[in-house]
C-alpha cells in the first residue's frame, strides 16, 4: 500500500508516525522543504519527500498521486485542502482523507466521497481502519 501525504501540519506528522510501519511507501509533498527537516523519525527507506506546489497536477503526479492508495491532505487552509483534494480525485480507487478546521462543510465533501477528519479532534482510527481493511 502506498500513501501520499500533502502538507506539513502537526496532524499530518502524527498520522505519518502512526502509518510508518503499516504502509509500504510514504510520499510527502509540501511547498516548503524546510518543514520536513524536523521529521527525523520519518527518515526511512520507504519515505520520500517532495518539494513543490501541491495545486499543480504535474507536481502531484511527480509526487506519486497515480500510484497512491491513500491520500491525506492538510494544507493549513480548508479552501486549499479542498481544492487539492478535488485535483487528486482523478483515481477513483484511492481514498482521500481531508483534515479540516471548519467542519460545517464536511457533509458536502463526504457526499463527494472524501473522508473528513476534524483537525481539533483527530480520529486516527478512521485512517487505521481503512488501512486494515486492505491489508
Predicted regions: what is each one?
Residues 1-135:
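Cytosolic regulatory regions of ion transport systems
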Amino acid at each position: 500500500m502506498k500513501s501520499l501525504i500533502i502538507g506539513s501540519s502537526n496532524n499530518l506528522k502524527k498520522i505519518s508516525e502512526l502509518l510508518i510501519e503499516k504502509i509500504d511507501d510514504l510520499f510527502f509533498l509540501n511547498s516548503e522543504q524546510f518543514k520536513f527537516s524536523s521529521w527525523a523519525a520519518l527518515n526511512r527507506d520507504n519515505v520520500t519527500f517532495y518539494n513543490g506546489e501541491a495545486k499543480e497536477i504535474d507536481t502531484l503526479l511527480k509526487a506519486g498521486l497515480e500510484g497512491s492508495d491513500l491520500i491525506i491532505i492538510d494544507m493549513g487552509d480548508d479552501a486549499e485542502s479542498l481544492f487539492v483534494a478535488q485535483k487528486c480525485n482523478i483515481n477513483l480507487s484511492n481514498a482521500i482523507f481531508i483534515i479540516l478546521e471548519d467542519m460545517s462543510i464536511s457533509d458536502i465533501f463526504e457526499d463527494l466521497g472524501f473522508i473528513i477528519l476534524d483537525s481539533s479532534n483527530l480520529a486516527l482510527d478512521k485512517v487505521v481502519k481503512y488501512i486494515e481493511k486492505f491489508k
